[in-house]
A protein has these predicted regions:
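Helical element adjacent to the flavin cofactor pocket in flavoenzyme catalytic cores
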Residues: 2-49, 53
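Short, hydrophobic alpha-helical segments
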Residues: 21-28, 136, 190-198
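A short local loop/turn or secondary-structure capping micro-motif enriched for an aromatic residue
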Residues: 38, 114-117, 179-181
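Active-site substrate-recognition segment that forms the wall
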Residues: 54-166
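C-terminal catalytic lobe of FAD-dependent flavoproteins
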Residues: 142-214
Length: 214
C-alpha cells in the first residue's frame, strides 16, 4: 500500500455505519420508495433539509444520469493468501481482487454500458473467474459464494456531482465505480455546504456544487 493508504471490507463498513446511526437515535427506513415531491424541507412537520442520494432512483431529476452495469463474484478460497487488493490489466475494464476476512475474495467488476439488472452473463463470469485463476492457482478450488449484478449511477463525464435544488435540498449522485474511494471527500463537501453554506471543501477537492439544476 501507499503511505497512509488502507483497505476496508465494504459490507462490514456499512454495518458499522448502520449501528452508529441506530446508536444516535436515527430512524432508518429500508426499501421505502420516495421522491423529492414527498418532502417540503423547512415547512412545519417536515425536515429542515433534504439530502438526495437515491442513485438511479433520481434519474427523473438528474439530467444525464445513466446506469453502468457491474458484476462481481464472491469466493471462498482457503488456498489463497493474498492480503492486499490486486489490480489486473484487462482489455475491457479494470478488474480487482479484493481480499476480505477468512479467505473470502471479491473479484470484479465488469463495466457494461447498460442498466440491465438481469443475472450475470456467462461471458462476464468466465472473464472474472479466469482473471482470478491467472493470479493464483488456488482459486481453482475456491467455492463460489455469490455472483451479483447491479447498475452504477453514472453521469456523462463519469464524475460525481453535488447539486443544490431550491434552498434546502442537496443532491449527491454519479459516484460511478468509485463510491467507497471518493465518498469521504463528497461527505466533507456536503457537510461544509449543509452546515455553513460554504463551498471551500468542494473547491479543495476539485468538486463543483451546481445550483438549481433540474
Amino acid at each position: 500500500l501507499l503511505p497512509g493508504e488502507g483497505q476496508l471490507d465494504n459490507r462490514q463498513l456499512l454495518e458499522a455505519l448502520h449501528q452508529s446511526l441506530l446508536g444516535q437515535g436515527v430512524q432508518v427506513h429500508w426499501h421505502s420508495s420516495r421522491t423529492l415531491e414527498d418532502f417540503r424541507p423547512g415547512e412545519p412537520g417536515q425536515p429542515d433539509g433534504l439530502i438526495d442520494c437515491r442513485g438511479l432512483g433520481a434519474r427523473a431529476q438528474c439530467e444525464g444520469l445513466r446506469g453502468v452495469r457491474g458484476e462481481v463474484v464472491r469466493l471462498h478460497a482457503p488456498e489463497v493468501s493474498l492480503a492486499r487488493p490486486t489490480r489486473l490489466i484487462h482489455p475491457r475494464y479494470p478488474i480487482y481482487i479484493a481480499p476480505k476476512q477468512d479467505h473470502v475474495f471479491v473479484i470484479g467488476a465488469t463495466e457494461i454500458e447498460t442498466d440491465d439488472l438481469s443475472p450475470p452473463s456467462v461471458r462476464s463470469t468466465l472473464e472474472l473467474l479466469s482473471a482470478a485463476y491467472t493470479v493464483h492457482p488456488g482459486f481453482a478450488e475456491a467455492r463460489i459464494l455469490e455472483i451479483a449484478t447491479q447498475a452504477r449511477p453514472t453521469l456523462r463525464d463519469n464524475l460525481p456531482a453535488l447539486r443544490v435544488r431550491g434552498r434546502n435540498t442537496l443532491q449527491i449522485n454519479g459516484l460511478y465505480r468509485h463510491g467507497f474511494l471518493i465518498a469521504p471527500a463528497l461527505m466533507d463537501a456536503a457537510l461544509d455546504w449543509v452546515l455553513h453554506r460554504s463551498r471551500a471543501q468542494a473547491d479543495a477537492w476539485g468538486l463543483h456544487i451546481m445550483d438549481d439544476v433540474a
